[in-house]
Amino acid sequence: ELRKDPLLISLAGTKKKTEEARTLLTDSEKTAFFFVTLPLALPIAVIERFISWVQAFQIPVGGVIVNEVIPKADTEKLSPYVANRMQEQMGYLKLAEEKFPGMIRAVLPLYEKEVNGLEMVSRMAQSLSLGSESKI
């Protein structure tokens, strides 16, 4: 009998919590997963796999954010290494747009220092509010 068996009581509680979590996670009015990637082959492939896993459970995907993109600059003024990285990143940004059509919500720059503290968080928030319209 359920009322007398502590294991069954615990399992019933776990089942209820799991059902509540599933209901919340699959409710597109309350939940959406956003994935953050870098403009590199492996992180893009990982996010692609994660998105398919999340969608398999009917969990809404809100979009993809591409982080740490080197801002556009006059390549003649850059070191060959940085100029090459910029070119590589442009190719990976195109790949991300192909793999996640209509899902890129923001492209965030590579900042000169780690995002730490109010000033940097404010800059990151501003970049996020610009979304994919930001000029990187």
Regions found by a protein language model. Give the residues of each.
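Basic, amphipathic N-terminal segments
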Residues: 1-6
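A general structural motif
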Residues: 10-19
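C-terminal lobe/tail of nucleotide-utilizing enzymes
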Residues: 18-136
